[in-house]
Amino acid sequence: MASTYAVLSEGLEKRFGDVHALRSLDLAVPRGTVCGVLGPNGAGKTTAVRILTTLTAPDGGSAQVAGHDVRREPAAVRRGIGVVGQYASVDGDLTGAENLRLFARLLRAPRSRAAELLERFELTEAGDRPARTYSGGMRRRLDLAAGLITRPDVLFLDEPTTGLDPHSRNGIWDAVRELTGEGTTVLLTTQYLEEADQLADDIVLIDGGRATHSGTPAELKALVGSYAEVVVLDAAALPAAAAVLDQLTGSEPVLDAEKRTAGAVTTDPTVTLPLLVRELDAAGVGVVDAGLRPPTLDEVFLRLTHRKRAGHPVPDRPSAGHPVADGPPTDHSRKEPAA
């Protein structure tokens, strides 16, 4: 089983004093895939990553990364992983080439690896310039290159595109896709849910120290259902439109006065567009546009974490039938705990 998964944990537990940060975390990440780990602040993501990268010891359970046990073989785990944090790890006073050669020397990698990575990330021409003169996108590419010096089996990637413009963000996304195409496994933590939607083969949602849901992006969206949205003729009609949406969907509507929109998620298959239009008309709401569409991952995240906190039941399984709560790991990231 260990040969199938690049990251495999069972029953991970971690306490910090009275705080139970991780509660029986099970995770199974197949080799050569991207697993997106999402959750509110304080949910357990950071603690989980610190354990998997051998920076923190678990209080219970077990974990293997790149085929090695994090407790018994921490040095072997570190040789098999790369870690790219949210903040730049490179020295701004050194050139790009000097930074990578320094990493190569520290990690006992060939000196030629630095030149190879500069070329791969289109930094060769800037290689003789101090890193502090690089743009945000260039520095993130240099960070990513530094994390790949040892050709890791598993790359831990934290907030890889924070603060980047769309063009630079797309460049990082393309680089991550190339890595998985070559067989590297990526564990991605990000607050940009569009990023997880674009990159992740599977997503684990952690809340309150547990993995509450997991599956592909499409499966998690299917849990939530559809998103009903209307554009009203007059912003003054938004409260009335919200009342209609609340009655039909049972969800708290989201209002945008500037765009004159009201929207809410619904899992009720009887909520159709004709029904929505009729109810709005009966309420005297003038409508410019109305529609039902699949939810975004942001809407899924807000819906599932809000329902959990509000005490409402959330389905245990995505529509495709993959377990999302308790049970043994499958080919999808399984339940996990908090940070």
Task: For every predicted segment, state its role.
Residues 3, 269-339:
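C-terminal coupling/interaction segments
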Residues 10, 231, 256, 291-293:
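Solvent-exposed beta-strand sheet faces enriched in polar/charged residues
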Residues 82, 108, 143, 149, ...:
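A generic structural signal for secondary-structure junctions
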Residues 4-9, 14-208, 213:
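ABC transporter nucleotide-binding domains
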Residues 14, 27, 230-233, 264, ...:
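Preference for bulky hydrophobic residues occupying beta-strand positions
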Residues 173-267:
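ABC transporter nucleotide-binding domain
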